[in-house]
Amino acid sequence: PELRPETYGFSKKDYDRKIFLDGVLGIQYGNLKEILKILKKTYCSNIGYEFMHMGDPDEKSWIRDRIEGPEKDIKFTENGKKAILNKIIQAEGFEKYLHVKFVGTKRFGLDGGESLIPALEQIIKRGGNLGAKEIKIGMPHRGRLNVLANVMGKPFKAIFSEFFGKTVSSKKDFEGDVKYHLGASSNREFDGNSVHISLTDNPSHLEAVNPVVLGQVRAKQFFHKDKERKKVIPVLMHGDAAFAGQGIVAECFAMSGLPGHNIGGTIHIIVNNQIGFTTAPRFARSSPYPSDVAKIAQAPIFHVNGDNPEAVVHCAKIA
């Protein structure tokens, strides 16, 4: 009933009456029919937005300006769509090859979450356009090999050698570690902007890498003399169960606004495969969504289906 205009005193004859909106929803005047059409298109389609819990009116307006309005569709050029498709094909082809070539070998595939790859590409491209010089990534096992191959540019030879128990690396200290613990670094160039990307090594302990990445970012910002905290971007990826269940996640959010720990914000990506090892969501958390922990820091949250890669990339662009 809260979604019906009648709840707020509107009657049927009000549906065609013009209302002055002063730019809200991207229009100056609109009747209830037009307003409802825009609201349904924005909030009842491919992306679910949570931002009304945020305390800063300017931050809420910033998000509204980018999602509400008759012209705020998810739009990509022909080349943009081809780039997204190309990355999806690369991600899926990589997983299929590993499944055929190394049957039964533990690899923590990205099956079903392939949209993560074009989303990361968008973050790198958009970040470079906005002046970012470095992107620090921390992530769990799930999809790590795919990210190493298709985002970081790690040679396939090195990845496949690790399946045979061989290490192609100058880092002798890392020999013998499992392939989905290893990190990498590389330089990527988009639109003439060079961005250095590094994926931090991490142990089997889920989410333990988070404060390491955040500390690296803080140090890099210091060396870049980046007082506005815009040159180095942290990106942390999570599984749904670990994000809600590991206390270190809440601790990092609780410290994020403190003067000694503030890094200007973090992009978090939750790859939600609806299960934590063997635990169903209803046995894993008390809240509806795993992302509810992020409300500690009044962070905006976007819910998007992984089978809609254009919507996923659109969210990455806003982030």
Each language-model region and where it sits:
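ATP-dependent adenylate-handling ligase core
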Residues: 309
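Structural signature of the thiamine diphosphate
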Residues: 312-319
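Extended, charge-enriched "interface" segments that sit outside catalytic cores
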Residues: 1-116, 132
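Active-site pocket-lining segments that scaffold enzyme catalytic pockets across diverse folds
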Residues: 97-157
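Cofactor-binding active-site loop characterized by glycine-rich and histidine/acidic residues
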Residues: 136-306
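Short Gly/charged-rich anion-binding patches and loops
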Residues: 122, 289, 318
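Structural motif corresponding to the C-terminal cap of alpha-helices
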Residues: 92, 96, 124-131, 216-224, ...
